[in-house]
Structures are given as C-alpha cells and as structure tokens.
Amino acid sequence: MSSLSVNTALAGGLTAGGLVAGASLANAPPSPMLESYYGTYQACSPMPSPLLLPSADDGRALEPLSPLGSDNEGDSRRRSRRARFHDAEDITTQLAQALKSSHRPDTSPLIEILPSLTHEQVMELRAEYKRLVKTGPERKGVNLAKHIRARLKDEDPLLMKASYSVALGRWESEAYWANFWYQGDKTRRELLIESLMGRTNGEIRLIKEAFTDKKYDNSLIKCMKEELKEDKFKKAVLMVLDERRMEEYDHYGRLQPIDYGLVDQDVADLRRAVRSEKGGETAMITIIVQRSDSHLRAILQEYERQFRANFARDALKKSGNLVGELLAHILNGVINRPVRDALLLHHAISASRKDGLRRELLISRLVRYHWDPDHMRAVKQAYRERYNRGLSDAVREATSGEWGMFCEELCIARTPPDVRRFDKISYSVR
C-alpha cells in the first residue's frame, strides 16, 4: 500500500497508509404519466394546509436557541455540550492518524469532529489536509473525502457514505447525491429531487460548480442529459439546472414585489391543468419550477381561496409519478419547510427500518439539514410537535453502530453556529 505523511511540526513523522435542453418541454414524451412512481410524498401523511402558512417574519413558532452548552430539546438522553475550538492543523493531524495504516481506521475522530464543522470549516480542513498529508513518491496532497471513502468503503459502507458526504462540504455533497441515484438502484430518484428542486439559482450554480465526474467532463448538466431518459421529469431537472427560477430578491437584497396579475394567471392555468383529462403536466412544471417561493406562496393561498382546495394535493393526485413528486417537494417547502423536512426525516427513519437501501435517504437528509443549525433546530421542533418525540431518539432507535452515532451527531443543532477559534500567537518574556 502507498503511505501518507503529515508535514506538520505537531505531527512529526506521522504516517498514514491505505489511500489507495434539447427539445422543448411541451414536446417531451409524457412517459412519467405512464410510469407510476411510488415516492416519498405518496408514502407520507397529508401535507399541511396552505392556510397555515407562517409569515416570513413570524418567529412565534420557533423557540429561542438553546444557550451555549446544551442541546437537550426534549430528547431522553441529555447531551452535554462544550465549545469546540477550531484548529484545522490539529484536526488534520487527528484525522490522518485515525485513517493511517492498513488496520481498521479509528472512527472516533470522524464521528466527534466532522458533524460539528460548518461548511467553511470543512473547506478549510480539506485544504489543510491536502497541504499537510502527502502520498507517493511525488508527495501529492491527499483529498480528505477520498481518503475517508477509500478507508471505510469496505469496513463500514454506511459510515463511509455519511462521513464522506460531510467531508465533501455543503455543495459538493448535493452534487454527490444528485448523481448518486443512477450508480445503483435507479428507483431512488428522491436523492436527485431533494438535491436540486426548490433551490435558488445561486444555490444551483454552487452545486454545478462543485460537481466532479470526469465521465461527464465535470458537468452536472451533461450527466443529467445522458442519464435521464427523455421525459418531462428530465425537462424539469434541466430547467432547474439552467437557472431559470424567478429571483426572490433584487441586486440590493430587497424582496421582489409580487406580480399579482401573474399570480391570477398562474392560478387559472394550474386549475385548468389539474382538471384536464389529458396533459397538464407541462403547465404545472413550467409554473412551479420557475416561480419564486413568495410567488408560489401567493399562488397557493389564492388557489385555496378561490377553489377551497389544496393545490399541492391536487397536483399529486394528477401526477402519481416523478413529476408529482418533484412538484410536491417544491410546494411543501413553500408551505412550511421545517415541517416538510421533519416529515421527510420521519419517512426516511421508517423506510430505513424496512429497506437497507433507503438508508441513503436518511443520511442525505440529515447531512443536508445539519449545514443550517437554525433550520435544523426548527426541524427538530416540528418533528417533536408532529410525532411527539425527539428526533435524536428516533434516529438512535432506527440506526445502529458507528453510522448511527454519526447520524445522531448530525441531529445536534449547534449553537452558536460559528465555532470558536484560537489563532496561534507568539510572545516573549522580558
């Protein structure tokens, strides 16, 4: 095996081995209508009503953040917390030591450290790891995420997926999940839907920039064009990747005014689409995928006011397939994102007990939510209110071993979200 070395005064001679839009949307074949897909939203309990939409500035539904040093949130096992002082060089030394040699890696540092880092800290750690940990006669820097994958893929595949996706960082992990589905069981389209749908144009841009796969010239668009078959689901995905979504804010960061004339037209078009005997998906995709959250929120409220019906449910009834799944994901996020994500976690926890292949859903969802501590806190509160139990307890019961411990760590909404840092200083004694 090749060997790695860490070039740091702290580590000394530490070594580590073991690294080994083509046609138009309207002309797309209507295959999703003919291909039933029993996905997440068809397996979940009813969605919340748009009448319960919280306003953007309504903070009454959220409890204040826990004081530093606690994250008890009602879970049965109280977690003691301590401030983590971030030192990328020290962490690099710990992780390289843990991953070294041909023996089973010491996974404790992975479990204790990786879930606690912000995206920015992960990026800093990856750069430091490549700078300090070298391999081969040419002393090339080692990619931390790839090192984790190489050392754990046979030892503990589930822990590998969880720790590898965190080590990729926020945006590359989404690119990983977006193209993960076609590498194995191609029925796991939720991984693709949840990585891309409902994102801002800026987020989509970051995900595309982070995508790496030489087979597709590091182009996520090329990957989707080649891997997805020609249907309206594919056209919806490419529409998202083309960054065609209405912007929520202007260049000065101000919320864009809602065009209520366009809202009325969209409501009429959507009503016509869900009531038509044939077709209708093209109109639904075009509107739901391309409108901003605030515009969609206005559509849902006006639709319910006019027709006393929940459009999200009507759309899922109309399209019991991939198109219905992607529309439901976007709309549920508009209605109430914390509740939607609590529902998705509950679904993943239940599904992973029955089907080992569905554990990727639980991992991907926990990794996604943990990057935003405030959102994770809101999700945990929504989970408790909806299911009358703590998220950490539910995850602990549904998982096992070290990957389960890693998932529990992802559930911790760390407050404050920024981690303390000590800068190295020098001083002299007179």
Q: What positions do the PLM features span?
A:
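Structural signature for extended repeat/solenoid scaffolds and their inter-repeat hinge/linker regions
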Residues: M1-R430
